[in-house]
C-alpha cells in the first residue's frame, strides 16, 4: 500500500472539538509534526476534514 506524509501546519487551539480529535486520530500533536500513514480511504477522509490545518505529501 502507498504511504503519505501528513504535516500539521496550523495550531488546533480554538478549533472544533471534532477537528482536534481528528488530528489526534491522525497522530498529530504539534505544529510541524509529521507522520507517515497508509493511503486508505479512511485516512483520506480524516485529512479532508482538517485540510486547512495539514499539508500532505505523496
From Swiss-Prot:
Which InterPro entries is this protein grouped with?
Answer: Ribo_uL30_ferredoxin-like_sf, Ribosomal_uL30_bac-type, Ribosomal_uL30_CS, Ribosomal_uL30_ferredoxin-like
Could you name the domain of life of the organism this protein comes from? Bacteria
Which UniProt keyword terms apply here? Ribonucleoprotein, Ribosomal protein
- One Gene Ontology biological process: translation
> Which PROSITE patterns does the protein's record reference?
RIBOSOMAL_L30 (PS00634)
Q: Which Pfam families match?
A: Ribosomal_L30 (PF00327)
GO MF term (any one): structural constituent of ribosome
**What is the similarity comment for this entry?**
Belongs to the universal ribosomal protein uL30 family.
Its assembly, as annotated, is: Part of the 50S ribosomal subunit.
| Stated name of the protein | Large ribosomal subunit protein uL30
Amino acid at each position: 500500500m502507498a504511504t503519505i506524509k501528513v504535516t500539521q501546519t496550523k495550531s488546533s487551539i480554538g478549533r472544533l472539538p471534532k477537528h482536534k480529535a481528528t488530528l489526534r486520530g491522525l497522530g498529530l500533536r504539534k505544529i510541524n509534526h509529521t507522520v507517515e500513514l497508509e493511503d486508505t480511504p479512511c485516512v483520506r477522509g480524516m485529512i479532508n476534514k482538517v485540510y486547512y490545518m495539514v499539508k500532505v505529501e505523496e
